[in-house]
Structures are given as C-alpha cells and as structure tokens.
From Swiss-Prot:
Expressed by the venom gland. Pfam families: Toxin_3. This is Sodium channel neurotoxin MeuNaTxalpha-4. Its main location: secreted.
Length: 86
C-alpha cells in the first residue's frame, strides 16, 4: 500500500514539472536570431514573446551575435550544434 502511494506521488510530481533552459533561440533551419546592439530590447522582445523570462544580445558568442534567452520553455526550438541551413 505504501508503494502505491509513493508511486502516485512521484507521478504527480513528474507530470506537474515543466522545465526551462537558457539558450540561443532558433529560427527555422537551426539559425539564431541575429542582433547587433547589446543594449537593444530586440532580443528581450523575441525571447519573452516565446515564453522566456528575459533575453539579451550575446555579442561574439558561440554562434556569433545572437539572442540568448533565459528560462526558455522546452517547447521552443533552440540552436543546436550543426550548420544553419538558410
């Protein structure tokens, strides 16, 4: 009986948890949203529109100048290693 309660509680916790991550938000074809001004609100707008807490322009980052989002939901595509196919 105790195992049934423990398993039920674990399933409740697992299904109710949504995770998020910090990453470069990706356009279709695995390309980053490019930015050129670190003080512009462009990236923050792109990120928050897609459900992130905030965002900023990462200058000279891994994929060049791109929008970096903080606490981006899992259902939003992020830039992954590999080529950008424009």
């Amino acid at each position: 009986m105790n195992y049934l309660i423990l398993i039920s509680f674990a399933l409740l916790v697992i299904t109710g948890v949504e995770s998020a991550r910090d990453a470069y938000i990706a356009k279709p074809h695995n390309c980053v949203y490019e930015c050129f001004d670190a003080f512009s609100s462009y990236c923050n707008g792109v990120c928050t529109k897609n459900g992130a807490k905030s965002g900023y322009c990462q200058i000279l980052g891994t994929y060049g100048n791109g929008c970096w989002c903080i606490v981006l939901p899992d259902n939003v595509p992020i830039r992954i290693p590999g080529k950008c196919h424009r």
